[in-house]
Amino acid sequence: MSEKIGILAIGHGSRLPYNKEVVSEIAATIAKKHPDYVIKAGFMENTLPTVMEALADFDGTGVTKIIAVPVFLASGVHITEDIPEILKLDPETNEGKITVDGNEIPVTFGKPLGHHELLADLVFERAMEVM
């Protein structure tokens, strides 16, 4: 059986709709560029779907592994405590198992965006837009 990967983009969430739109558009762009992967978006607070609801949305997709990636710039309590708890991750390996379609499959958790040259370029681009 070949591996079919699901990617869960995790956003913070907000009472304002723009936050959901941005994270959902990022997930849609990833899906368009990488059609062999199943891409979902979920949110930590104030926005649906929740992370748990987004994980449930992988049912019926045939995924054999899920990679959860926070769409956050830096680590905070959601990254270090809340998301690992939701995903039931082993604190030493950052890996866990979740049930999809009645089967236990591995889930791993990526790092926040952090410093990256592309982000630095984007910040500079945004500055130039208002110059």
Swiss-Prot record:
Pathway listed for it is: Cofactor biosynthesis; adenosylcobalamin biosynthesis; cob(II)yrinate a,c-diamide from sirohydrochlorin (anaerobic route): step 1/10
Q: Which family does it belong to?
A: Belongs to the CbiX family. CbiXS subfamily.
Q: Does the keyword Lyase apply?
A: yes
Give the superkingdom in one word.
Answer: Archaea
E.C. number, please? 4.99.1.3, 4.99.1.11
Which keywords label this protein? Cobalamin biosynthesis, Cobalt, Lyase, Metal-binding, Methanogenesis, Nickel
Kindly list the GO molecular function terms attached to this UniProt entry: cobalt ion binding; nickel cation binding; sirohydrochlorin cobaltochelatase activity
Catalytic residue positions: 12 (proton acceptor)
Listed under catalytic activity are: Co-sirohydrochlorin + 2 H(+) = sirohydrochlorin + Co(2+); Ni-sirohydrochlorin + 2 H(+) = sirohydrochlorin + Ni(2+)
The record's subunit annotation is:
Homotetramer; dimer of dimers.
Species name: Methanococcoides burtonii (strain DSM 6242 / NBRC 107633 / OCM 468 / ACE-M)
The identity of this protein, by name, is Sirohydrochlorin cobaltochelatase
Record's function text: Catalyzes the insertion of Co(2+) into sirohydrochlorin as part of the anaerobic pathway to cobalamin biosynthesis. Involved in the biosynthesis of the unique nickel-containing tetrapyrrole coenzyme F430, the prosthetic group of methyl-coenzyme M reductase (MCR), which plays a key role in methanogenesis and anaerobic methane oxidation. Catalyzes the insertion of Ni(2+) into sirohydrochlorin to yield Ni-sirohydrochlorin.
Annotated Ni(2+) binding lies at: 12, 78
